[in-house]
Amino acid sequence: MAQTHAMMSQFNGRKRVRKFFGKIPEVAEMPNLIEVQKASYDQFLMIEEPKGGRPDEGLQAVFKSVFPISDFSGTAMLEFVGYEFDLPKFDVEECRQRDLTYAAPLKVILRLIVFDIDEDTGSKDIKDIKEQGVYMGDMPLMTTNGTFIVNGTERVIVSQMHRSPGVFFDHDKGKSHSSGKLLFAARVIPYRGSWLDIEFDAKDIIYARIDRRRKIPVTSLLMALGMDGSDILSTFYDKVTYERDGEGWRVPYSVDRFKGMKLISDLIDADSGEVVAEAGKKLTVRTAKSLAEKGLKAVKVSEDDLLGCYLAEDIVNYETGEIYLEAGDEIDEKVLKILLDVRADQINILDIDHMNIGAYIRNTLKVDKNESRQDALFDIYRVMRPGEPPTIDTAEAMFHSLFFDPERYDLSAVGRVKMNLRMDLDCPDTVRVLRQEDILAVVKMLVELRDGRGEIDDIDNLGNRRVRSVGELMENQYRIGLLRMERAIKERMSSVEIDTVMPQDLINAKPAAAAVREFFGSSQLSQFMDQTNPLSEITHKRRLSALGPGGLTRERAGFEVRDVHPTHYGRICPIETPEGPNIGLINSLATFARVNKYGFIESPYRKIIDGKVTKEVIYLSAMEEAKHYVAQANSSLDSEGRFTEEFVVCRHAGEVLMAPRDHVDLMDVSPKQLVSVAAALIPFLENDDANRALMGSNMQRQAVPLVRAEAPFVGTGMEAVVARDSGAAVSAKRSGIVDQVDATRIVIRATEDLDPSKSGVDIYRLQKFQRSNQSTCINQRPLVHVGDRVEKGDIIADGPSTDLGDLALGRNVLVAFMPWNGYNYEDSILLSERIVADDVFTSIHIEEFEVAARDTKLGPEEITRDIPNVAEEALRNLDEAGIIYIGAEVQPGDILVGKITPKGESPMTPEEKLLRAIFGEKASDVRDTSMRMPPGTFGTVVEVRVFNRHGVEKDERAMAIEREEIERLAKDRDDEQSILDRNVYARLTDMLTGKVAVEGPKGFSESKKLDSTVMGRYPRSQWWQFAVEDEKLQNEIEALRKQYDESKEALQRRFMDKVEKVQRGDEMPPGVMKMVKVFVAVKRKIQPGDKMAGRHGNKGVVSRILPVEDMPFLEDGTHADIVLNPLGVPSRMNVGQILETHLGWACAGMGKKIGDLLELYQETGDILPLRQRIENLMPDDNHNEPVRQYDNESLYKLALQMKKGVSIATPVFDGAHESDINMMLEDAGLDSSGQVTLYDGRTGEPFDRPVTVGYIYMLKLHHLVDDKIHARSIGPYSLVTQQPLGGKAQFGGQRFGEMEVWALEAYGAAYTLQEMLTVKSDDVAGRTKVYEAIVRGDDTFEAGIPESFNVLVKEMRSLALNVELDDARELIAQRVLSDRVEQ
């Protein structure tokens, strides 16, 4: 991003300057791209927080939820006090090299309280309290780049998307019942605990299920909560009072009850007796209201109108207690008669009209067989624990533990918040269990839905899906570990003498440590980091997966879950997702999105106040956004920030609509906020078809880092952000001055925030030719020179695939779109030989080979140069220890590490015995098991590491490596020491200069004014002996000296620690005495069969590499680098590549013009034309670098950078338009059609018509033909079937499968078929004979019985079918003999 500084006139040439085409100013800062990972894990560990004041979240919450632990009798309790981390044993780099896990020891402070219990009263007194820190295993730490190092490999924990806890209302879409009736259901999902489902059936009875078990009527659940029948009815229904009035009944008149009713009989005023509305009339809301206004208080109804109503209360004879009718009974003729008999003059009726209010709860109550709370509890107990006889206590306890026990049931804060929102409750989010009100509210809402009021939930809405990041996943895992530990602690507390033990003795931390190890090592969400290039690392860390434990499975996930949802806007990228079975289940976070404390994804918006768009930015989740009208970032605004159009395109409640401008209250912050990082790197994304953009995003992640990285001419402005946040390019931690630079490190003397406790020196170690997880090469190169001023955040070194701090995945190459002799048929790519000769697409890959010398039963293996039966020639590259030299060129079959293994003694012939007695020949009892180069790999050895077990004597090579390492550490220490000395003595000189010293070193005459000459007479170390009169200054000098001594001591201590680590032996797997790792660098030039791609999903395979002179060329004699097929564009609809071609062409043309002016400046010394050209190119606006303020030297540096081609940025959805491209082309003096006349390289003739030519940014993908091509003659065979193995990794053969056999059968090629199925496969004896015959030069062979036939026979015998094989020739001979005998 271009930063504008008012006074900046210097350009250091260490960053790429781009011309921005974006019109929309950036309001919000893009959050750090790997913040998701770092923030989540920091919140979990809370290392920085003070031990006492940690909030209840993360690790603290886990311990708080499991502790305190009491024993079964209650005589002792183990309490949690706090936890702290010690420093990790090894730093990140050491863990990588030694295959260790980067982790810090966790120490938990526990308090054991022992009680005295009075046996008579049962009261407790504290008898004893012991507190102790207990080691609880190692907790992996996150590196600065958001990864973990587990057993030496970098891993990433992917965030998981899952269904948010809370309550969800849904229906079955009419699928369950043949009538197509919608059956509504509600589901309460806790974070952990039992699920509660409440659902309608086809008969409109409401049932509840717990944990998907057998259903029970919902009224039983309500009874179990302590309600009786009449409570339930009065909770769900209002009452209407009917009073007897002569022949009929009188009912109070209410507007709500009567509106919308069609009258069957006349409506009669009960007081006056007049008809206020005739039969057959429909009462509208207006009519109903006007009647009430006219004073209608009650209406008269006949006896018949009571039929079909339901009683709201029991009808009881109060004297005898006899119940005549029960609440909920339906009134029919019989009931009316009873009402007459008992002279009930006033009865309460349930307000059920079957239109607005249905009788579902009343009907359910009638169906329910349970009468009391006890019945209901027993019923629930039988459902949950079938086969166990219930007692009232066990049933109560079980029911309580289902939903009301914080140990067993946890809604989590999120669940409570979601529940409050959905059902308008106000319950604090600390109440994490269900309450009776919650269950009632769910049932009420479900009934409302059935009555046609309210909306069902959309489970794919991002308001109902949340993200579980590293911290939370780890928290759940650790809780499982602690719960396993809790059981063991309880048992141990009961079995030991509690007065004498310490907390340490009660705790076995193995289960907790094992849970952590299992999570990082084998969880589905802990993944081997995709480290092909910086973009793939960042994308991997920002990935959201719906798979994994507690998530979906590929097979069960339907279309809806995978689909793009309106709420994804600005939160999840609609483009970047894998092709194949995981499509839509694995997503990527959008560029500006962040995850809030509840785990919902938030997107930023600008506030609009009184129609004016402000700079104020707020983050909203999908739920909060729904009620707003959100305008797009590219809506046109006037100078005051008001909308120019009357109607604005905006989003509201998931729909896109045109809204009046005064309705709009929010606006997007940036046009790229809806896509992910990878998609935001594609220029002209808006002109590409979405499917191709998806491929483009995915293929950028597979680009191999090239030997010479080159940033794209046509970028999007995201390149620098990705390079910085991924950690590939090294940025300065503090401002300072570069003190030393070489290829492996940069030493910077800090000039800001010089905290006395911190060192005043920053040493940046650069990674040189390290192997990444994908075997690509990680190499960092310094960009600074000694004496350069560096600001905080400046890029000081480039990493893999970065160029001047910009992401650089490929190269800019000159492309012509035209067919060429069929070599670009079906997306093939025709390349020029120049690309190979100039190493344009050459990459370095580093292979790691590892060999271990073990202790075997027959004796130890040995790594040595002394290998039996190997020619001296084969050992030429090995040193005396048997390990290859660094720099040796190796090819397939070369020995990398010589190793011999003892073999079992075989009985010796007398001759051998004699020879051994004479020569002491030992070679016969060992066999050569050296590590050799695998087939197909050629390269150079770049690094060797030797690891020895503790106490095993080190060989010469190990000692040499160790010496080298210690020298390097010493150099670091000395450099830091010299800068420390320089800084401290400079400060001391400043303090002393001009002051009068009252005493000093030996031979110093008192009361002399100090200056450089006086002080220069004494060595620096004696300057501390000068004393001055000013007491305050003297104290400052003493403090400086103390600080200096402490820093020196700390430095030496650090150095000694590291040396001790280097000299100490290594942790090894059991049985391994010594291990050697050899790293071989392989240089891969591009060749036919390699896969290449652009950024727009335009992929292809190199078909041929053509001599430069045969390639088509331009009028100035420049040959095209690549020829692509024009037919690859129209059907794929990725027109972005054509626009990129034109713009790239303009950039190169412009660069050429600047190059010419640069030459002019070097000849004449006149910089004005160059300055004008560059200033015209980069107008002053909010995006561009302020080139007008550059001094001449800066301008010259900039022109040098632009000479190859001007870099531009065209942000997604806000980039260059056709008119801009035409202008650029015209400025560069090129034809605005973007087409030129091309000439055939072979004949020199011009082609028939002009051809589109320009620069495209092409990538070489990690699908290299060298990794795929494979051949075998003799190799390993499978043990059982004796057939060759398959696959390159196993050095396998080609499978001659079922269909291939059919083909040979169809041709009747019997002998070929026999050969394929026997001697070339699993006829063991036959294939040996063939080999011997070929060696003899004989080409005849005889096929035997294939081994797989014998396997078949064995299998048949195992089925008790005796199959015996008879030799056919013998059978025929016998038959012939018997025939003769008969004759």
From Swiss-Prot:
CDD domains: RNA_pol_B_RPB2. It catalyses: RNA(n) + a ribonucleoside 5'-triphosphate = RNA(n+1) + diphosphate. Keywords: DNA-directed RNA polymerase, Nucleotidyltransferase, Transcription, Transferase. It is an enzyme of class 2 (transferase). GO terms for cellular component: DNA-directed RNA polymerase complex. GO terms for biological process: DNA-templated transcription. The keyword GTP-binding does not apply. InterPro entries: DNA-dir_RNA_pol_bsu_ext_1_sf (IPR042107), DNA-dir_RNA_pol_bsu_external_1 (IPR019462), DNA-dir_RNA_pol_su2 (IPR015712), DNA-dir_RNAP_su2_dom (IPR007120), DNA-dir_RNAP_su2_hyb_sf (IPR037033), RNA_pol_bsu_bac (IPR010243), RNA_pol_bsu_CS (IPR007121), RNA_pol_bsu_protrusion (IPR007644). Its EC number is 2.7.7.6. Pfam families: RNA_pol_Rpb2_1, RNA_pol_Rpb2_2, RNA_pol_Rpb2_3, RNA_pol_Rpb2_45, RNA_pol_Rpb2_6, RNA_pol_Rpb2_7. One of its GO terms (molecular function) is DNA-directed RNA polymerase activity. Belongs to the RNA polymerase beta chain family. The RNAP catalytic core consists of 2 alpha, 1 beta, 1 beta' and 1 omega subunit. When a sigma factor is associated with the core the holoenzyme is formed, which can initiate transcription. DNA-dependent RNA polymerase catalyzes the transcription of DNA into RNA using the four ribonucleoside triphosphates as substrates. This is DNA-directed RNA polymerase subunit beta. It comes from Bartonella tribocorum (strain CIP 105476 / IBS 506). The lineage of its organism: Bacteria, Pseudomonadati, Pseudomonadota, Alphaproteobacteria, Hyphomicrobiales.
